[in-house]
Swiss-Prot record:
The gene is mcsA. GO terms for molecular function: 2-methylcitrate synthase activity; citrate (Si)-synthase activity. Partially inhibited by ATP. Belongs to the citrate synthase family. This is 2-methylcitrate synthase, mitochondrial. It catalyses: propanoyl-CoA + oxaloacetate + H2O = (2S,3S)-2-methylcitrate + CoA + H(+); oxaloacetate + acetyl-CoA + H2O = citrate + CoA + H(+). It comes from Emericella nidulans (strain FGSC A4 / ATCC 38163 / CBS 112.46 / NRRL 194 / M139). Catalyzes the synthesis of (2S,3S)-2-methylcitrate from propionyl-CoA and oxaloacetate and also from acetyl-CoA and oxaloacetate with a greater efficiency. Also has citrate synthase activity and can substitute for the loss of citA activity.
Amino acid sequence: MALPLRTARHASRLAQTIGRRGYATAEPDLKSALKAVIPAKRELLAEVKKQGDEVIGEVKVSNVIGGMRGLKSMLWEGSVLDADEGIRFHGKTIKDCQKELPKGPTGTEMLPEAMFWLLLTGEVPSTSQVRAFSKQLAEESHLPDHILDLAKSFPKHMHPMTQISIITAALNTESKFAKLYEKGINKADYWEPTFDDAISLLAKIPRVAALVFRPNEIDVVGRQKLDPAQDWSYNFAELLGKGGANNADFHDLLRLYLALHGDHEGGNVSAHATHLVGSALSDPFLSYSAGLLGLAGPLHGLAAQEVLRWILAMQEKIGTKFTDEDVRAYLWDTLKSGRVVPGYGHGVLRKPDPRFQALMDFAATRKDVLANPVFQLVKKNSEIAPGVLTEHGKTKNPHPNVDAASGVLFYHYGFQQPLYYTVTFGVSRALGPLVQLIWDRALGLPIERPKSINLLGLKK
């Protein structure tokens, strides 16, 4: 969008005000920190609206029949995904976030709740602010009895993603937004109950995931006390039955995984579905339930488990004392059979995924991971597969993505139920879409309603 010079300068100053790194001296809580930045963001939106007739791109037939790939058509505040640079969160790279965001009371990895704060406000919170936020999440994690009864009613063969989506939707009995909207609330105030619902869901979703993971212990999980002095990921691990000091590395992996997967721009299925349903003023519980159903699709959220299955099959075929040629031959066998190599390529990225590198850096500091033959296959594949895929010639990005490592790392730490990896992804992905739902309401964004066209219309 080409803004006039004066307007562009003004918008730039506003953006700097909104996105600057700041440590507030009064140590406001998250809602207060958000409230402080809303006026500037609204002013920026008002400036941008004046340029409503400006052209920001063109729509090609390939965009329409190709899943709208590459088409800039929605507002998303928390992150920007560049094809070459990868993901940035309010301008910060993953390495920036790992360096700047507060860590847990134990462990060395950035906290996903600190990432949520950054996504929502554009500011890096202090350690004390994050500790207070972690405490709030622990205190708001309780589930009503009807949710426990609902979880007990599920048939044993119901897919875990179906379960977590149903429970998330059913939690809208707790929605402050739905209740206040029914009574009547000023549109300018929509963001406050939306914020409250988003925090409530963020607090509850680890326990919901644990209900799905431990279906024979519904009452135990439903009433398990969380440690208010610990962080969101630590308490999630406790709910999964993997607490304690002996699982410290798993806790750090979970922190890193949840932070890395929290937001990846708005065009992916889970984020877009949440935004779409939320644009109809559905509450955050209903909206994110829709996002979870999108995440359940094999083209979106099932990649980590597919990578693990493929790697384990590869190990069974070539053993643990493999050569580079063994790996190369298995890759070619996969491609020649008409299958894809799981964990490689990306819908937007054209360079190596920095999230994959973050997980590999994590592994590089753990001798037990490096010694694991399954992980060694992951590492060797990352060295050989790009060349094979380039020679094959049918991919725009031959590099590994985050899924190439995440499932295998979970497997190493004893989390060996691949069907539940997407559920964990669903806990993480709540971060970004819930942030955007809050901003959708704070900015008064309208219902989403694109225009469709049929094939004959395109042919003309």
